[in-house]
């Protein structure tokens, strides 16, 4: 089972520079003193910038008990102990409100102070600063900035206008956890000074629009943070083409009808200098020998590699680098985690946070399907190693059950002499960026199998693509744009479309049990979760709960896509055996990856939103 422990990632005091900047942050019934610290962040060509962090002077690490358990009610001492604390109860949820306000109040004060220090005019704040609200966690910056401007003598009407020209909102996902709705009594307890402003902002919306669905405060007396961002921000963007279209046409359609000019797309990108130059220097050196070093500054120059897609000498060198990285991963996992890999097997990797919509459970069901095939004598042409890297949110029970299933399969298969020579399951411990830098260059295949319409973008898909892994995926998130760039032959697409999925939800017509009853492969795989073999290595409570979830609910529709997923996996494994054709797919993916550089993303944000 997953067990959480604290990660003191800033334990070296040399990382942090304590500054003289401090603020008194006002909460309902008490104040807290904050202190600003700076971390120098190294950028391209040894340039640096500063990351400003705020801490509470009174934080007390002795509050932490077993794992990450701590006293959630002692706000003065626990406020900055843990990012995203367990929110399975009201104590954890209101702690998030305190944390979010602490962050935005400090940031808002810093913005105002720095504007004034530069001789700026707060009446023209939008000419000096842009606040990009990422998801709804920082949304209280809108009423807080209004409050601070009013404290300095600016009337409410003008303060609202100023802030509405200063703040922009990025929606990163349509999942409920990122579209926060805070009960009014939470806010009245934690940040009562904001409530008159929030009431006024809502009043203006209600007077202007008859549609109750766009109100900031709903009939259940909850404050919809995304609604506030949309009404009082000047830009709303999604993070991949499909995601933005879903926002406009479905999830936020009522707002799009009101403010079509505010909506725009900014497809995510990755720091390709980390995910290619840093973590795969051998591949970088090969590319430099072929096309020069211009791609190190401009990732779109990787397109020049397209000239070599039929050059077998180059293709062999790419395969040689991949094999070397696979051997490196084998050695690294053996030394650090005691995991033994077969470097001649196919490395089929899925690394991302554990969430039902990302459907690690479907990959696990495929492992069960393949286990049965091998038991029946149908052996793969080449051994397969299925590698998972994931962490579940502490309170996300089903996600933890999926991790438990994967760990059980790992143990069961490793001890089976009939199956283990041909199939291996690995769940790497404590998945993080350091591990990703080893896993991604070594991957042959990467899994991007989220339920269509649920993944806003994804970025692991881009990192794998840049390192020459080939994707199996749904038409979701940035997979859609990847498919447009590389074409049908160089990505393996399966599954229902986002339109079909959205229609299922609208009609409430999906019944998981009907797939179980009518498909022998599905029934056999799901039944195996609670089989005697699995119970011998696993925990009955976890396995039975996951079994019942898949059989009776399956909210993220694992089963409708399963048979096509199985068929697509078999096709991708078969295609892997033509090594030159596979190397060509690798090179096409790499040559088309330049678009997904964060340099391009940031330039588009600046051109269309920030105007810096």
Regions found by a protein language model. Name each.
Residues 1-612:
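A conserved ligand/cofactor-binding region detector
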């Amino acid at each position: 089972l997953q067990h959480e422990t604290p990660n003191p990632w800033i334990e070296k005091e040399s990382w942090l520079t304590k500054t003289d900047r401090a603020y008194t942050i006002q909460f309902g019934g008490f104040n807290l003193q904050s202190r600003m610290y700076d971390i120098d962040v190294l950028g391209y060509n040894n340039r640096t910038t500063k990351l400003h962090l705020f801490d509470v002077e009174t934080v007390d690490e002795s509050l932490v008990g077993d794992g990450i358990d701590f006293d959630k009610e002692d706000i003065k001492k626990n406020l900055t102990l843990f990012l995203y604390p367990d929110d399975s109860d009201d104590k954890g949820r209101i702690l998030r409100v305190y944390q979010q306000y602490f962050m935005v109040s400090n940031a808002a004060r810093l913005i105002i102070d720095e504007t004034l220090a530069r001789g700026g005019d707060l009446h023209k704040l939008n000419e000096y600063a842009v606040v990009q609200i990422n998801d709804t966690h920082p949304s209280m910056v809108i009423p807080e900035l209004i409050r601070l401007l009013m404290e300095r003598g600016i009337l409410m009407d003008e303060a609202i206008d100023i802030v509405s020209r200063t703040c922009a909102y990025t929606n990163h996902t349509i999942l409920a956890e990122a579209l926060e709705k805070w009960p009014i009594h939470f806010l009245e307890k934690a940040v009562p000074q904001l409530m008159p402003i929030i009431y006024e902002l809502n009043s203006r919306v209600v007077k202007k629009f008859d549609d109750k669905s766009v109100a900031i405060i709903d009939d259940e007396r909850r404050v919809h943070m995304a609604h506030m961002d949309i009404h009082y921000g000047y830009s709303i963007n999604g993070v991949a083409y499909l995601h933005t279209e879903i926002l406009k046409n479905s999830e936020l359609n009522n707002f799009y009808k009101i403010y079509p000019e505010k909506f725009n797309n900014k497809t995510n990108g990755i720091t390709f200098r980390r995910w290619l130059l840093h973590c795969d220097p051998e591949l970088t050196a090969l590319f430099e020998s072929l096309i020069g070093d211009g791609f190190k500054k401009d990732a779109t120059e990787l397109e020049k590699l397209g000239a070599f897609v039929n050059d077998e000498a180059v293709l062999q060198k790419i395969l040689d680098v991949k094999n070397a990285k696979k051997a490196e991963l084998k050695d690294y996992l053996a030394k650090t985690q005691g995991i033994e890999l077969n470097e001649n097997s196919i490395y089929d990797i899925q690394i991302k946070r554990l969430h039902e919509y990302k459907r690690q459970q479907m990959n696990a069901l495929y492992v069960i399907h393949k286990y049965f095939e091998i038991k029946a004598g149908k052996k793969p042409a080449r051994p397969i190693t299925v590698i998972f890297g994931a962490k579940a949110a502490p309170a996300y029970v089903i996600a933890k059950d999926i991790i438990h299933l994967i760990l059980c399969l790992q143990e069961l298969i490793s001890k089976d002499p009939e199956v283990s020579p041909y199939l291996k399951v690995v769940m790497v411990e404590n998945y993080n960026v350091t591990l990703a830098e080893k896993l991604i260059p070594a991957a042959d295949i990467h899994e991007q199998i989220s339920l269509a319409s649920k993944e806003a973008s994804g970025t692991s898909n881009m990192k794998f693509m840049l390192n020459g892994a080939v994707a199996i995926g749904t038409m979701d998130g940035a997979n859609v744009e990847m498919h447009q760039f590389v074409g049908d032959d160089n990505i393996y697409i399966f599954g229902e479309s986002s339109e079909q999925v959205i229609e299922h939800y609208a009609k409430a017509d999906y019944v998981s049990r009907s797939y179980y009853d009518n498909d022998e492969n599905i029934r056999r795989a799901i039944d195996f979760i609670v089989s005697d073999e699995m119970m011998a290595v696993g925990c009955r409570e976890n396995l039975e709960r996951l079994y019942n979830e898949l059989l009776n609910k399956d909210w993220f529709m694992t089963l409708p896509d399963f048979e096509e997923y199985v068929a697509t996996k078999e096709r991708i494994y078969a295609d892997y055996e033509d090594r030159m054709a596979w190397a060509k797919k690798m090179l096409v993916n790499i040559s088309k990856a330049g678009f997904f550089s964060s340099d391009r993303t940031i330039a588009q944000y600046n051109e269309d939103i920030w105007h810096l």
